[in-house]
Design a protein with these regions (language model features):
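Hydrophobic ligand-binding cavity/cleft-lining segments
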Residues: 1-44, 157
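Short loop segments at secondary-structure junctions
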Residues: 13-15, 72-73, 96-98
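Beta-strand/loop substructures that line and gate deep hydrophobic ligand-binding cavities in soluble
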Residues: 79-136, 152-154
Length: 157
């Protein structure tokens, strides 16, 4: 059974610049929750079909593989695979008239393990931990967006 977790933030960037920051692998250590180091890039990142493999910090998710499934201007999605789960992570970039962009982050996932208590474990622990991780990622992403906005000639709010 597929499950979903969502989180959102607003950044002082255009959708194009917000997407550019989101897909900049050199910036991932500063905002992706649990990101340890990049292990491998296959293909032309961030184009459809490209794959990155990264390792988490100690005690984290282990090795994570992300393959680009959607690289459109307003949405970026990857098929994710790691020891505990697999699914799709998507980021949507929705511009507003005042020059800010809402970033909606979503993970649709299935657990790889869990046995007979998988559903209960997901409800009580895993889903909350994933949501917290998405929220921490987006908080740090928004903090990274402020200097990026200044470089683009915008004043962060």
């Amino acid at each position: 059974m597929s499950r979903a977790v969502v989180a959102a933030t607003v950044v002082p960037l255009s959708p194009e610049h917000a997407r550019g920051l989101w897909t900049d692998l050199e910036r991932w250590p500063s905002f992706v929750e649990g990101f340890g180091h990049l292990a491998e890039v296959r293909g032309e990142w961030p184009e459809r079909g490209a794959t990155v493999v990264w390792n988490s910090t100690p005690g984290g998710r282990g090795q994570v593989t992300e393959k680009v499934t959607d690289d459109s201007l307003r949405r970026f999605a990857t098929k994710i695979s790691e020891e505990a789960l697999q699914g799709e992570q998507s980021a949507a970039f929705v511009g507003a008239e005042d020059g800010v962009t809402r970033v909606d982050l979503r993970i649709d996932y299935e657990l790889s393990q869990g046995g007979p208590f998988q559903a209960m474990s997901d409800r009580l622990f895993i889903r909350r931990a994933l949501r917290d991780a998405l929220e921490r990622t987006l908080r740090r992403y928004a903090a990274e967006a402020a200097p990026a906005a200044r470089r683009c000639g915008r004043t962060p709010r």
